[in-house]
Curated annotation (Swiss-Prot):
It comes from the Bacteria. Part of the 50S ribosomal subunit. Forms a cluster with proteins L14 and L19. This is Large ribosomal subunit protein uL3. GO terms for molecular function: rRNA binding; structural constituent of ribosome. Residues 125-151 are annotated as: Disordered. Keywords: Ribonucleoprotein, Ribosomal protein, RNA-binding, rRNA-binding. Signal peptide: none annotated. It holds the Pfam family Ribosomal_L3. One of the primary rRNA binding proteins, it binds directly near the 3'-end of the 23S rRNA, where it nucleates assembly of the 50S subunit. InterPro entries: Ribosomal_uL3 (IPR000597), Ribosomal_uL3_bac/org-type (IPR019927), Ribosomal_uL3_CS (IPR019926), Transl_B-barrel_sf (IPR009000). The keyword Aminoacyl-tRNA synthetase does not apply.
């Protein structure tokens, strides 16, 4: 059995536990996903199951993409692979639903963070900025020295500087499943998950969770 499914982030709300405690949750529409390809060690060098999510019209896909999905019986926008040692448990065309998850289970959620554009070091890296007084000007949000006068006197790779922020793959680990609503393909997890509403996310069984 593969370890995860694809879905989209719906948004956040809150629910109450039996003691009346408020729990912030993110609602994720998970699946249904369709198995589109089986990767084998003999043919591909590794074993994995490729699944697809979100049906689209034929004109939204190229002819090669349509041909690739012919065996699955559905045209799907998003394709992702999950490594597994039990490819015999799946075949092309199988439908996977949110019922593979259960309340109380721990999951990891992978998404793409919101893009913030070009940002300075204070917002991007949390720098404190320069002095606000004693004759300083235009130094409030400056990064300060980036290495001049040190040994060696050059700029090191990965020095934290201004640049594009966000729009990167982010994984949030060990979120607790609060509820599962199979008839609506909904998964409620405690806390926040990366990305904007309606953004594509990948939900998998927690790697580090108990």
């Amino acid at each position: 059995m593969i370890e995860g499914l694809l879905g989209r982030k719906i948004g956040m709300t809150q629910v109450f536990d039996p003691t009346g405690q408020v729990i912030p949750v993110t609602i994720i529409e998970v699946g249904p996903c369709v198995v589109t390809q089986i990767r084998t060690k003999e043919r591909d060098g590794y074993e994995a199951v490729q699944i697809g999510y979100q049906e689209v019209r034929a004109k939204s896909l190229t002819k090669p993409e349509q041909g690739h999905l012919r065996g699955a019986g559905k045209l799907l926008r998003h394709l992702r692979e999950f490594r597994t040692d039990n490819i015999a448990d799946h075949k092309v065309g199988d439908v996977l639903t949110v019922e593979m998850f259960a309340p109380g289970q721990r999951v990891d959620v992978i998404g793409t963070s919101k893009g913030r554009g070009f940002q300075g070091v204070v917002k991007r890296h949390g720098f404190g900025g320069g002095p606000r007084t004693h004759g300083q000007s235009d130094r409030l949000r400056a990064p300060g020295s980036i290495g001049a006068g040190t040994d060696p006197g050059h700029l090191w790779k990965n020095t934290r500087m201004a640049g594009r922020m966000g729009n990167q793959r982010v994984t949030v680990q060990n979120l607790t499943v609060v509820d599962v609503v199979p008839e609506r393909n909904l998964l409620l997890v405690r806390g926040s998950v990366p990305g904007a509403n309606n953004g594509l996310v990948m939900v998998r069984r927690a790697i580090k969770g108990s």
